[in-house]
């Protein structure tokens, strides 16, 4: 997840499934504070994780490991520091042995935060310092296992793909597991054309001496190019390219993942168009069978690839333009959806905490909640100039109160206040008067 708002609540849910004896204590914590999801990260950690685990009996002598993968994908450096500080408190437990296994790219905020944790409380393991022979051996095992599954599925013969090909693939991977994983998914998605796709990789890959990044570029390009049907006319190919860049560009700059259903509504496309665009992209996208579950990238390196013009050529996505598309989509969706008393309570003063969350989600679907939370951030990142009587001006004039009301229903009114302060740096004096007058009239 790109933000930490659901980090500890997600962890608590997983604990209830994997450690049944914790379920009672976690449920009690939620019962005591029904608004627990809106509390600070430290409160969530202590009420949902640390507190319940401390209630376990010491006689069980159990050891537990919390696995936190890719912490660097959390965009807020402050949240990263808080999470690391809180996780370090795991050592304070006396009734059970709790350890944290954490992976991350070596971003500055991560390294800085780790340096402020006592050396005795953590061990660092730098992947780049692992001998190449060890990594290549592991990649070879990974490839052998996954290609073996493909061999069995399509009865490709006991000697497929063979030791020589396996060694070639290990060389092409250049120590990158993401290359090996993407290659295996690409081959497997080819189904009866699995052998042909393997040949595409072998013929397309440049010399093993080339930098690892180039090999990753080649495998990503192969996946994208195969998603465009070669039998299309030039005009149809152009349309397919544009749709691919439009939808993938949105996926890689989303500030929180969305389902294909929500994404289609946010981009004002039919769900069929989005599904058809993504149907050959399972090698790079994690697309759940349930269309209400969010779509995610298999690896953040694809985001880096797609936003770099030098690496992906015709598939390049302009970062600012992608944010502009999402900002426009958010504003249009909110303008079409938001209204006074959107939850139809017909009772001024109703508290969000007293209304069932499923009812709120029915009135404010995921894509509308996303638009309310992130439209200002997308606007900021687009770098687009604003002026009087433009779409932002018109939206604020018509819907600022409806927007704030929606945020209050999803218990994110503080995000609205932060967004309003952010708008001050973007909009003109005449625009500022709109919401200052509106907010003044509230009191």
Residue positions per predicted region:
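Extended alpha-helical scaffolding segments used for macromolecular assembly and cargo binding
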Residues: 329-396, 402
């Amino acid at each position: 997840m790109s933000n930490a708002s659901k980090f500890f609540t997600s962890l608590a849910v997983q604990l209830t499934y994997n450690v049944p004896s914790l379920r009672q204590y976690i449920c009690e914590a939620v019962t005591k504070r029904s608004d627990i999801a809106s509390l600070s990260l430290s409160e969530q950690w202590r009420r949902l994780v640390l507190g319940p685990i401390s209630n376990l009996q010491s006689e069980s002598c159990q050891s537990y490991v919390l696995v936190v993968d890719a912490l660097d994908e959390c965009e807020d450096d402050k949240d990263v520091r808080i999470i690391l500080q809180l996780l370090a408190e795991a050592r304070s437990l006396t009734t059970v042995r709790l350890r944290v296994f954490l992976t991350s790219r070596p971003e500055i905020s991560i390294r800085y935060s780790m340096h402020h944790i006592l050396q005795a409380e953590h061990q660092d393991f730098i992947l780049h310092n692992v001998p190449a022979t060890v990594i290549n051996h592991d990649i070879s095992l990974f490839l052998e296992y996954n290609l073996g599954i493909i061999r069995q599925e399509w009865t490709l013969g006991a000697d497929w793909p063979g030791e020589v090909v396996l060694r070639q693939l290990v060389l092409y991977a250049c120590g990158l597991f993401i290359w090996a994983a993407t290659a295996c998914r690409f081959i497997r998605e080819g189904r009866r054309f699995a052998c042909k796709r393997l040949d595409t990789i072998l013929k397309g890959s440049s010399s093993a001496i080339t930098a690892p990044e180039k090999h990753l570029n080649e495998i990503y390009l192969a996946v994208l190019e195969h998603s465009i049907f070669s039998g299309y006319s030039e005009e149809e190919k152009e349309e397919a390219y544009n749709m691919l860049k439009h939808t993938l560009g949105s996926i890689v700059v989303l500030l929180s993942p969305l389902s294909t259903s929500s994404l289609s509504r946010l981009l004002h496309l039919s769900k069929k168009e989005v599904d058809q665009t993504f149907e050959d992209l399972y090698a790079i996208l994690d697309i759940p069978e349930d269309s209400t579950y969010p779509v995610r990238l298999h690896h953040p390196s694809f985001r880096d690839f797609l936003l770099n013009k030098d690496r992906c050529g015709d598939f390049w996505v302009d970062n600012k333009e992608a944010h502009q598309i999402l900002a426009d989509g958010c504003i249009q969706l909110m303008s079409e959806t938001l209204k006074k008393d959107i939850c139809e309570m017909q009772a001024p003063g109703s508290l969000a905490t007293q209304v069932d969350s499923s009812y709120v989600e029915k009135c404010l679907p995921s894509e509308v909640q996303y638009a309310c939370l992130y439209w200002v951030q997308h606007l900021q990142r687009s770098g687009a100039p604003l002026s009087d009587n433009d779409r932002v001006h018109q939206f604020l004039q018509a819907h600022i109160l409806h927007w704030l009301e929606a945020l209050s229903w999803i218990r994110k009114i503080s995000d609205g206040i932060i967004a309003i302060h952010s708008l001050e740096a973007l909009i003109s004096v005449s625009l500022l008067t709109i919401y200052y007058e509106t907010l003044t009239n509230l009191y």
